[in-house]
Curated annotation (Swiss-Prot):
Protein name (database record): U1-lycotoxin-Ls1r
The record's note on its domains: The presence of a 'disulfide through disulfide knot' structurally defines this protein as a knottin.
Family named by the database record: Belongs to the neurotoxin 19 (CSTX) family. 04 (U1-Lctx) subfamily.
Tissue-specificity statement: Expressed by the venom gland.
PROSITE patterns from the UniProt entry: SPIDER_CSTX (PS60029)
Lineage: Eukaryota, Metazoa, Ecdysozoa, Arthropoda, Chelicerata
Disulfide partners: 44-59, 51-68, 58-86, 70-84
GO molecular function: toxin activity
GO cellular component: extracellular region
Length: 107
């Protein structure tokens, strides 16, 4: 009986040690991933900023990635130019409204 307890204790110790090593490796991988995501966030274009030169570089919002929305602007000289900005499309706004309403109702 004593030998069984010693073997079980040894196995528990080995399993806990190996799982803690795995957790440390996982934390290191997550840290590298978070650092890469942070670098991406710094390079993306925030909401309401101009994205005319980089139409696919908008940042992520709460639920969806912002979309580059373009409009035609008439300058004081009468010249028409296209200007784009990162924003939330109407169908994404509606989805966010429904999700927010659902959270209020269901907790």
């Amino acid at each position: 009986m004593m030998k069984v307890l010693v073997v079980v204790a040894l196995l528990v110790t080995l399993i806990s040690y190996s799982s803690s090593e795995g957790i440390d490796d996982l934390e290191a991988d997550e840290l590298l991933s978070l650092m890469a995501n942070e670098q991406t966030r710094k390079e993306c274009i925030p909401k309401h900023r101009e994205c005319t030169s980089n139409k696919h570089g908008c940042c992520r919002g709460n639920f969806f990635k912002y979309k580059c929305q373009c409009t035609t602007v008439v300058t004081q000289d009468g010249e028409q130019t296209g200007r784009c900005f990162c924003g939330t499309p109407p169908h994404h706004k509606a989805a966010e409204l429904v999700v927010g309403f659902g959270k209020k109702i269901f907790g």
